[in-house]
């Protein structure tokens, strides 16, 4: 969490070097096409929408196309088919990114959280490792559930009940899934 939020992982620091599109195998091409033609491809400036080699985690997924395709399909479902509103889903993602010091996910999803309507002050507090002071009830439920899940590897009955009362069983499952995936 010591890196500034605007800093993005560089290609030079990648352990898996980008594979030029013309060097993809048939199986890798299927995966690349699935990523680019799915909902991620419509997200402006995303790793899936940029021309050239796939970036972000998708570049790594190319090394095992069958597994990579399963993972990217799961990720697309968690991100784009969740019962949680995009702002809350992105909030869970950035809480997870900060908890695990995942610079790429923070870089990719902090902007998306703001675009989905998250107050910039909430993002700044999370970036600094602080519990945001001013959150809506829904935001507080997602924040508390996510932090507790990561810090204790479980959630208390009280935290679970708050999430269940507000989001229902599907929402709780979607919240668990987004935290686990990211």
Predicted segment positions?
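Mobile cap/lid helix-loop segments that border enzyme active or cofactor-binding sites
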Residues: 2-84
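Membrane-interacting alpha-helical segments
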Residues: 49, 88-91, 127-128, 133-142
């Amino acid at each position: 969490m010591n890196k500034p939020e605007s800093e993005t992982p560089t290609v030079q620091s990648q352990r898996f070097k980008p594979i030029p599109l013309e060097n993809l195998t048939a199986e890798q091409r299927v995966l690349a096409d699935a990523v680019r033609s799915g909902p991620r491809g419509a997200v402006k400036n995303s790793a899936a929408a940029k021309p050239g080699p796939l970036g972000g985690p998708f570049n790594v997924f190319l090394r095992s196309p069958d597994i990579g395709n399963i993972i990217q399909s799961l990720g697309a479902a968690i991100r784009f088919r969740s019962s949680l509103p995009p702002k809350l889903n992105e909030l869970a993602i950035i809480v997870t990114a900060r908890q695990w010091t995942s610079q790429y996910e923070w870089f990719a999803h902090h902007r998306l959280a703001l675009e989905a309507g998250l107050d910039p002050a909430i993002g700044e507090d999370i970036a600094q490792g602080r519990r945001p002071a001013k959150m809506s009830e829904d935001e507080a439920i997602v924040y508390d559930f996510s932090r507790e899940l990561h810090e204790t590897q479980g959630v208390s009955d009280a935290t679970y009940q708050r999430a269940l009362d507000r989001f229902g069983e599907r929402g709780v499952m979607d919240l668990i899934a987004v935290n686990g995936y990211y």
